């Protein structure tokens, strides 16, 4: 599972 913050950076 990935943290929400890391997930947001991944789609940027």
From Swiss-Prot:
It is found in: Secreted. Belongs to the tachykinin family. Tachykinins are active peptides which excite neurons, evoke behavioral responses, are potent vasodilators and secretagogues, and contract (directly or indirectly) many smooth muscles. Expressed by the skin glands. GO terms for cellular component: extracellular region. This is Kassinin. The modification Methionine amide is found at residue 12. One of its GO terms (biological process) is neuropeptide signaling pathway. Keywords: Amidation, Amphibian defense peptide, Neuropeptide, Secreted. It comes from the Eukaryota. InterPro entries: Tachy_Neuro_lke_CS. PROSITE patterns: TACHYKININ (PS00267).
């Amino acid at each position: 599972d990935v943290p929400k913050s890391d997930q947001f950076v991944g789609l940027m």
